[in-house]
Amino acid sequence: MKCLILSFAIFVVLASQATAGNVIIGGVCQDCSPPVAENVVVGGQSYRTGRPGQGTVYINSPGAYLGALDGPIRRTGAGGGGGGGAQYPDGYSGRLPGGTYLHNKDCVGCSISGGGD
């Protein structure tokens, strides 16, 4: 039974690493925990900080998710004639399509990881 529990615990840890996503913070971080991620991109500069599979954290990097950090929420339709995608307003926090987590404001005291918290 102990072996089964240990096997399950190892599986959960491996699965959580394999499903790590990206976190985008559209502002600055103040008193935040150090980012836990494979890569951290701050102001467009990339730093390799963690292990493979831990996701990527973007801080104050507008190119991280094209269109996500500009203006109000706007979704273009099939006949819209504009570029695809969606835009999210200042202050938006939540998951984007594909599992990326967007925190479109400054982070104060945030715990940041590529797992999306």
UniProtKB/Swiss-Prot annotation:
List cystine links: 29-32, 107-110
What's in the keyword line of the UniProt record? Disulfide bond, Immunity, Innate immunity, Secreted, Signal
Instruction: Please give the record's induction comment.
Output: By bacterial infection (at protein level). Detected within 24 hours of infection (at protein level).
Tissue distribution: Hemolymph (at protein level).
State the superkingdom. Answer: Eukaryota
Q: Is Membrane there in the keyword field?
A: no
> Has UniProt tagged this entry with the keyword Repeat?
no
Q: Name one GO cellular component term.
A: extracellular region
Q: Name one GO biological process term.
A: response to mycotoxin
What compartments host this protein? Secreted
Q: What InterPro entries does this protein map onto?
A: Bomanin
The signal peptide stretch is 1-20
Miscellaneous:
Not induced after bacterial challenge in strains carrying a loss-of-function mutation for Toll. Constitutively expressed in Toll gain-of-function mutants.
Name the protein family.
Answer: Belongs to the bomanin family.
Q: What does this protein do?
A: Secreted immune-induced peptide induced by Toll signaling. Has a role in resistance to bacterial and fungal infections.
Q: What protein is this chain from?
A: Bomanin Bicipital 1
